[in-house]
């Protein structure tokens, strides 16, 4: 590496670093998903995700369509909620239903359970047939979560500074 390359200022980040920065910014600086739950009232969010496994395809999991909203919530909304609520515990149970279990009557509850420090603060949100956005909106509304001001959100610059 020449001295010229060492002292030359970078004009852009490398593509893989840029993708990572953009992903982090979606989590920490997205005003749509940035909410703070009352840490003195709630202690845990619990979700169960059910997967059906077919006998011929032992390696691949087939997601139950009633869980699509939960999966969308986990992928798009929960990372930001986790970041802004570090004292809140998030528990996700991945439950595999194979052919042996599917013959039995298994009660599949598509619930988002919110555990409070007191029993009166416990909440359940029915997730069947709802999109991730609707589940998230109901979570925010029922818990009384407070939206974080955009001025408080920190965004990592996507271009090197001089």
Regions inferred by a protein language model and the residue ranges of each:
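N-terminal organelle transit peptides
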Residues: 1-83, 106, 120, 148, ...
């Amino acid at each position: 590496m020449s001295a010229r390359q060492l002292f030359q200022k970078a004009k852009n980040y490398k593509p893989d670093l840029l993708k990572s920065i953009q992903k982090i910014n979606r989590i920490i600086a997205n005003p749509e998903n940035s909410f703070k739950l009352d840490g003195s009232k709630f202690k845990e969010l619990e979700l169960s995700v059910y997967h059906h496994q077919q006998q011929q395809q032992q390696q691949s999991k087939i997601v139950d369509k009633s869980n699509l909203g939960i999966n969308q919530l986990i992928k798009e909304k929960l990372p930001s909620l986790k970041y802004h609520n570090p004292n809140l515990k998030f528990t996700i149970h991945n439950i595999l239903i194979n052919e042996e279990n599917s013959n039995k009557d298994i009660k599949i509850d598509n619930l988002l359970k919110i555990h409070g420090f007191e029993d009166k603060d416990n909440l359940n949100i029915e997730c069947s047939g709802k999109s991730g956005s609707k589940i998230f909106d109901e979570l925010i509304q029922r818990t009384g979560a407070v939206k974080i001001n955009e001025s408080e959100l920190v965004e990592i610059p996507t271009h090197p500074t001089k």
